Amino acid sequence: MTRARRCEVFDADTVGVYHCFNRIVRRSYLCGFDPRTGIDYSHRREWLYQRLKSLAKHFAIDVLGYAILSNHYHLILRNRPDLVQRMSDEQVVRAWLKICPSRGQRCRGLSRDPSDAEIHAEQSRANRVQELRMRLSNPSWLIRQLSQYMGIRCNAEDQIRGHFWESRFGMRRLLDEAAVLACLAYVDLNPVRASMVESIEGYPHVSIGERLRAFDDDAVDTSSWLAPLELAGQCDGTSVTVVNRLSRKQLAEILDNSSSTELGSLPMKLEDYAELLRWLASQHRGDGTTALCRVPSILTKLKLDPVGLSSSANQFGRRFSTAAGCPASLAIEAERRGRLRIHGLGKRSQDHCRGSDSTESTAPPTPR
């Protein structure tokens, strides 16, 4: 079976949510303690985190979630073609030169703003602004800048040459709200599943830990780079749509009625999401036989199947290839790509994740 091309997975003209991931070459622990060499490279996780944070400020891409581990990372990104279209030509060029400064600035180690002459030089190149506008809302270019930076810096520290990353990064499109929820939980629980920490608050380089620290004592300012978790509007169990597959026209209608360009991520508050993660973590550890009886109330409000969500959140990477969603969402995505079907859940998995009150509910379960 041929591999889906990246251009099939990513739709540049539509706001979409994507799960992106990459692994270090030969699965070596080059961003943590490496048992083979006995060297601790944990400080490199902070390098990757700071670079991601810096890039997020200049790209027209929302970072919904992240997890940086010893030998791989996960990102949940939302492209924002609506934002980049609002930017002037000068703003586009200035943002790109902050991401990729001129050779002279790099050689001198400068971090100043680009000069008017540098901006004019870029603008005068044929089709250059149009190309840069496309890049600023393309997750592939953000991952490229992130991976290249880490590869060069880590190889320089080790005084070696060669590949740092195993291959090109993987990308999976999240087609509906339940897929976004399941994937975000999968990413945020990665350190817990890897037995690196026991609680969701205990790991420094994961999005849920950063959100909770900011919520508790304002110790970390996420407002400038990490997308808000809670959707705008009321979160009272009523139907709310995550903006993850709208056209520019549809998105413009929403933003015209709002003073903010932040879209949010999930139809729930941070407290509800944290409670859900703790419950999912207890399911993974098998803490007690009555855990299923203490299902978080948010699942009842959103009418989600707890068994299906738990299974999807713990095995998300194995269940879906280049797209994730309920069978109806996968069928629509297959039609968009001109394919007969997209690999998703097998019949056995669908039966396992089917809700007791509906024969159409599958994992990730779709809000009804």
Feature annotation, model-predicted:
Residues 1-368:
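Short catalytic/metal-binding and nucleic-acid-binding patches
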